[in-house]
């Protein structure tokens, strides 16, 4: 048996986690002196309230070694193989903690740690594929091999409503944040080679910006793997999300269109009103 585990930044819904029998290892979110578990003891809306009140971005940290060992140990004792996914190594030490836990359990030969080189449902796309393979009886080595092949084909991007949260987190300077607010600029953030990079900038109200962003990807979307696409957002209004879904449905490409809410870690850095369309290219 192969067990699939991911850290909480995969942003998969509780329904998907249950459907595919995936275990989630929460990262930590620190609001001042208080520490919370991503997806378990705090919500994104609570994070926004705290961040706006204190004019700063919460700190996030990897799971502890003890927590990781506690999650892994029962599966190791049962003789399972484990394939676990972490947020990009350039963004967190989550993957390193997983490797340390494998060493502490003397199970390096049965625990495979995959650096997703991604975030949010860019990880989730890989995790779901791995879980399907595990259910179909594939070995950990077979799953890991396919994941390494798929990683460069994951297309993860999003547009943000406000640059305030990126500025608070040190991901853009004060001048850019102020100009973005005055000019109503909304950057497209793309994940490439495990890092985030701002590419095209859109101007206008966020609802129209989101639709422009999605329609600009039409050619790539039509060439995507048809299994599934994620509309991942951090609290966009329902009408906007529905408009994105309608556009994706009109393409006639995807068998499954999923709408997860971004988790606490991603929401901490991007703020409310962020939306991304994530898929795997053929």
Across the structure, where does each feature detected by a protein language model lie?
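Mixed-charge interfacial surface used for oligomerization/domain docking
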Residues: 3, 9-23, 28, 34, ...
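Class I S-adenosyl-L-methionine
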Residues: 35-106
């Amino acid at each position: 048996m192969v067990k699939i585990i991911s850290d909480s930044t995969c942003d998969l819904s509780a329904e998907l986690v249950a459907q595919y029998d995936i275990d989630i290892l929460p990262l930590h979110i620190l609001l001042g002196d208080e520490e919370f578990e991503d997806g378990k003891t705090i919500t994104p809306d609570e994070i926004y309230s705290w961040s706006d009140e204190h004019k700063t971005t919460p700190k996030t940290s990897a799971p502890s070694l003890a927590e990781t060992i506690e999650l892994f140990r029962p599966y190791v004792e049962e003789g399972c193989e484990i394939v676990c996914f972490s947020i990009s190594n350039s963004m967190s030490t989550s993957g390193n903690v997983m490797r340390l836990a494998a060493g502490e359990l003397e199970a390096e030969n049965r625990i495979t740690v995959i650096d997703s080189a991604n975030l949010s449902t860019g990880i989730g796309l890989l995790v779901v594929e791995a879980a399907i393979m595990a259910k179909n009886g594939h070995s950990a080595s077979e799953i890991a091999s396919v994941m390494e092949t798929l990683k460069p084909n994951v297309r993860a991007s999003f547009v943000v409503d406000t640059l305030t949260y990126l500025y608070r987190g040190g991901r853009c300077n004060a001048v850019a944040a102020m100009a973005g607010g005055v000019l109503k600029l909304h950057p497209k953030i793309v994940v490439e080679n495990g890092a985030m990079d701002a590419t095209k900038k859109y101007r206008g109200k966020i609802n129209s910006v989101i639709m422009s962003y999605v329609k600009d990807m039409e050619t790539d979307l039509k060439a995507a793997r048809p299994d599934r696409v994620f509309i991942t957002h951090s609290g966009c209004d329902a009408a906007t999300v529905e408009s994105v879904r309608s556009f994706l449905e009109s393409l006639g490409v995807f068998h499954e269109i999923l709408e997860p809410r971004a988790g606490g870690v991603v929401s901490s850095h991007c703020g409310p009103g962020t939306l991304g369309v994530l898929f795997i290219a053929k």
